[in-house]
Amino acid sequence: MQAPAGLAVKAPLIANSDLMSGKPSLIGLTREEMGEALAEIGVPQKQVKMRVSQLWNWLYVRGVSDFDNMTNVAKELREKLKAAFTIARPEIVEEQISNDGTRKWLMRFPPRGAGRPVEIETVYIPEEGRGTLCISSQVGCSLTCSFCHTGTQRLVRNLTAEEILSQLLLARDRLGDFPDGSTPVGAYVPSEGRKVSNIVMMGMGEPLYNFEHVKTALLIATDGDGLSLSKRRVTLSTSGVVPEIFRTGDEIGVMLAISLHAVRDDLRDMLVPINKKYPLKELIEACRNYPGVSNARRITFEYVMLKDVNDSLEDAKMLVQLLKGVPAKINLIPFNPWPGTNYQCSEWAQIEKFADFINQAGYASPIRTPRGRDILAACGQLKSESERMRKTERLAFEAMMIANHGADD
């Protein structure tokens, strides 16, 4: 279903009773774990490896979400699989499509233990040569970064490897990115190749506070016999959980991004409070030692541009000094407004001056084009619906944003 640009689509709600049944999912299991699960339902040990390969292909190459579609699996085994496991997608509570083609899905996952169902947001950003999916790793966030909307939502829980991967699987479903899939009429997607070519762990939450589940999900996403994403097209963004940075490069091997945002400890303590635990000196040293870092595999430093806070040319000079010797590029992010914030975006002319100074010092300094602002899908704007403002306030704000879209950019 295609919606008018910038308006919310109430997607047909699928109850997904299979997902809500409490049955364990095969999605997100390693090959070893999947083999153990199959053995537990009676698959003969000599067949386990072959059956795992079959299921892996159906789940991650063909993209099926129903055991009945696994046509080369014997019916008796399919019935056993259906009785014991689920491979269902999460519910789509809402799908929104921005004026610029950005899509945002509000997804609902079932309770874990005694908890309640939870909601998270996932964003798809299409461009001519690539399609980037921004994936969440937690429900809410514990970091309370003062400029970030997600940081105003308390941490509810970590997402499982299944729930992290399901965001990618659902997006590929909706965009027709699996074999035999069809792209929605009028959808803005890359003209060639995969619709989802890149993923960034930049959604809700701090990925390195959920290291094991994120690691499992990303290793499955980059497995050459399945989803087969290149590790050079997967970026994990952290606010600076220093002890896990080396492990990220060593055990996962994806590209690294650092949510920097300030070049002085006193300011970063305020903007990104984790800096009080892991100050800039420790953070930059961890970046210097990141496995595989080189001019071909640079670390991205994200820097949100806040008017009269961190956008002076003196800040730019200190930034260049701070990163001296680190293979890096600096993404400058115009601040994306959200209801209740006290911050303002830097003037565009000041952002360009800042970028020019960094560029002349030898660092690539692209200014990130704001995407999805009108549906609160831009950087720093994500927050699950159940924790957002009252509905009337939200609708009024979104109407204002839609009316002003274009003037902002």
UniProtKB/Swiss-Prot annotation:
Other facts: Reaction proceeds by a ping-pong mechanism involving intermediate methylation of a conserved cysteine residue.
Subcellular location: Cytoplasm
Coiled coil: none
Record-linked SUPFAM superfamilies: Radical SAM enzymes (SSF102114)
Known function: Specifically methylates position 2 of adenine 2503 in 23S rRNA and position 2 of adenine 37 in tRNAs. m2A2503 modification seems to play a crucial role in the proofreading step occurring at the peptidyl transferase center and thus would serve to optimize ribosomal fidelity.
A single GO BP: tRNA methylation
Co-factor requirement: [4Fe-4S] cluster
GO CC list: cytoplasm
UniProt protein name: Dual-specificity RNA methyltransferase RlmN
Residues that hold S-adenosyl-L-methionine according to the record: 205-206, 237, 259-261, 336
Lineage: Bacteria, Pseudomonadati, Pseudomonadota, Alphaproteobacteria, Hyphomicrobiales
Membership in a protein family: Belongs to the radical SAM superfamily. RlmN family.
Gene: rlmN
Entry-linked PROSITE patterns: RADICAL_SAM
